[in-house]
Every structure is written in structure tokens, then in C-alpha cells.
């Protein structure tokens, strides 16, 4: 659903939108429809009844609408400073037992991530010191060093791309970045949502082998461009970062962008940095509802920052008509998703689509 927890520069854990590869100015309801449809599909995945799924989706849309109404009455600075602190989050209508259980699990996850993401933990897992200088370990097929055939034009001299990235950083962050020196870069296999794009991990070291791991991810034209027009940004990495800085309440200090010698655009951020994502497999109705409302809260806050909250709230109104309309769309989308998946599986079985099934 493109929402999750991550660390702020102050090392607090907040909940927010965490994937903005397609970000572009567009109608607010497109994002809300996508969230509502995702919740409906998640409910079906959990084998919840259609009536339960519809109630959860309606609750999620209502949360968005009511939060947006509140933002419409708030001072501009208060909207801008508002954030969802995961460790202090209070669900306004959730079951106290569910909230308490979720908070306990969250505290355990946060402690696990803190241990996993400290440099002393990451460095020995990702870096080998067997050669003349530190080097990222090859772990094919997930992490490997590119050849010219694998990545035409990527080359081995990244000085121009690094200099361009440095220029994209705020001046005060450049002072910090200049303490680190580039040592290595390796290709990193991306997730399902980014298949076909290039992603790499860069190793930078300061004094005493103090590491900084940067993820360099390809940014292509937004899928929204055919419907909204081209981005105002010449570099699509800049488009992603501009949207991220606008809509997130706090962002990675190393967010930046660059362009490779092969003409590809990239955006840059720290690798990992205490990222928390939802694992819904063992969830029940109450937990999905709570998570969906948190997503709606984060989305409404992002839209209130980037748009006019009062205008959006006025468009949605104070009744349930808007909620029901979005819910109807989400349930129909879920049905279409189910039909599409069945057709996909059928095509595999009939040999019309090749697929590799991992054991």
C-alpha cells in the first residue's frame, strides 16, 4: 500500500507514505481510490467476508474525509508540522485490546529494526575487507557487481554522477556528505513493484571505516504523465524527491538525485534506515481496519500539505455519499483484480505465459 514506518533525522519512528516513484500533481481521489482498492484486496486476501471488507473500506474513506475536514480548519503551520508518531499513535475508534496488542508488537519490531540497522550490524553483512579496500559482497542473484554487458553505459567511474548528486543536496548536508568517500557500488535486485528498473547500493566510508550505505534507484517518467502532462522537473529523480519532501513530514537527509552517463535518471536515499512495513498474513478485521485508518490519516495529511484541504473537504461533503461511492469503486476493483489473476493463472497453465515457480 506504499505506507510504513521509518526513522526521522531525529531517530523517531513515524508512519507515512514511503514510496513516491510515480508522484505527480493529479486529482486527490486517484490516490484515495488506490488506497481503498488496496484495502479491499487485502481484506479478500485475509478471507474476510464481502460485508466486512466493505465496512472496513468505508471506515478508511471516512477517516480520510474526517481528517481532511480537520486539516481544513487548522492553521497552515499546524498542518505542516503534524506527523504520525508510531510510538504514540492513538486510534480514535479502535478496540483498546487490539490497539494495545498492536502497540506491543510494534515496540518489538522497532527494537529489532534498531539492532538490524545500526552501521555495526550492516557493515559486516554487506561488506568484505578481504581485498585491498572494502568492497560490497556479491550475493547473487540479489546483489552483484555489474559488467558492461549487464548495465551498458554504467561504467566504473561514478565521479560525475556523485558530483551531480552532491549538488542536489542542501548545503548543510553537503558538509556531512563530504566526510564520506566513495568505495564501491553494486547492483541490487528490486522488488516486484520496481521490476525492470535499475537499483544499486553505494558504499561510502568516513574516518575509521564509518559507513554510509546509499541506495541509488532509477526514476522513469511517472505512469500518470499521459493523463496529467509531463513533470516540471527535467530529472525524474528530482521529481520523486520533490514530491517526497513535499508530502512526507520528515525525510532522509541524504535524499537527492543524479543522472548516469547512460542518460538514466536516479534518486538517492539511505539504504534501509529502520524501515517498517506491514505483514498482514495473520491480521484480523480489527487490525486491518486500524492499519487502513492510519494509511488514510497519512494520505490526508500529505494531501493537506500539497493541496488545499478546505477545498478537498468541501468537495467530499459531510455525509456518507462520498464514502459509499469510493467503497463501491474499491469493491468492483477488487472483483476485477480477482478476475485478472484467474486469467493470468489460466494463461500460465495453458502455456500462453511463461512463469518460473520457486519452491
Which residues fall in each region the model found?
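Long, low-complexity segments enriched in small/aliphatic residues
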Residues: 87-158
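Conserved ATP-binding subdomain of kinase catalytic cores across diverse folds
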Residues: 1-115, 160-359
Amino acid at each position: 500500500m506504499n505506507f510504513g514506518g521509518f526513522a526521522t533525522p531525529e531517530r523517531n519512528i513515524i508512519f507515512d507514505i514511503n514510496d513516491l516513484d510515480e508522484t505527480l500533481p493529479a486529482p486527490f481521489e486517484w490516490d484515495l481510490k488506490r488506497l481503498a482498492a488496496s484495502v479491499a484486496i487485502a481484506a479478500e486476501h485475509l478471507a474476510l467476508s464481502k460485508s466486512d471488507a466493505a465496512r472496513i473500506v468505508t471506515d478508511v474513506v471516512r477517516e480520510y474525509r474526517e481528517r481532511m475536514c480537520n486539516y481544513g480548519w487548522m492553521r497552515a503551520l499546524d498542518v505542516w508540522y503534524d506527523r504520525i508518531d508510531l510510538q504514540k499513535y492513538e486510534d480514535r475508534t479502535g478496540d483498546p485490546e487490539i490497539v494495545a496488542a498492536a502497540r506491543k508488537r510494534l515496540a518489538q519490531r522497532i527494537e529489532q529494526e534498531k539492532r538490524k540497522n545500526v552501521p555495526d550490524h550492516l557493515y559486516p553483512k554487506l561488506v568484505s575487507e578481504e581485498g585491498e579496500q572494502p568492497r560490497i559482497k556479491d550475493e547473487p542473484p540479489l546483489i552483484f557487481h555489474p559488467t558492461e554487458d549487464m548495465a551498458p553505459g554504467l561504467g566504473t567511474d561514478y565521479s560525475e554522477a556523485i558530483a551531480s548528486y552532491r549538488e542536489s543536496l542542501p548545503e548543510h548536508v553537503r558538509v556531512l556528505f563530504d566526510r564520506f568517500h566513495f568505495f564501491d557500488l553494486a547492483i541490487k535486485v528490486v522488488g516486484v513493484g520496481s521490476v525492470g528498473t535499475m537499483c544499486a547500493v553505494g558504499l561510502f566510508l568516513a574516518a575509521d571505516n564509518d559507513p554510509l550505505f546509499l541506495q541509488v534507484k532509477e526514476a522513469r517518467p511517472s505512469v500518470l504523465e499521459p493523463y496529467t502532462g509531463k513533470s516540471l522537473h527535467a530529472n525524474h529523480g528530482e521529481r520523486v524527491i520533490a514530491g517526497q519532501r513535499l508530502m512526507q513530514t520528515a525525510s532522509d537527509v541524504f535524499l537527492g538525485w543524479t543522472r548516469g552517463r547512460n542518460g538514466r535518471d536516479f534518486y538517492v536515499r539511505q539504504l534501509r534506515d529502520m524501515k517498517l512495513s506491514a505483514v498482514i498474513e495473520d491480521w484480523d478485521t480489527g487490525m486491518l481496519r486500524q492499519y487502513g485508518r492510519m494509511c488514510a490519516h497519512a494520505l490526508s495529511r500529505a494531501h493537506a500539505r500539497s493541496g488545499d484541504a478546505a477545498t478537498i473537504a468541501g468537495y467530499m461533503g459531510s455525509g456518507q455519499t462520498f464514502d459509499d461511492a469510493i467503497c463501491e469503486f474499491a469493491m468492483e476493483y477488487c472483483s476485477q483484480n480477482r478476475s485478472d489473476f484467474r486469467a493470468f493463472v489460466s494463461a500460465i497453465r495453458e502455456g500462453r505465459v511463461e512463469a518460473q515457480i520457486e519452491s
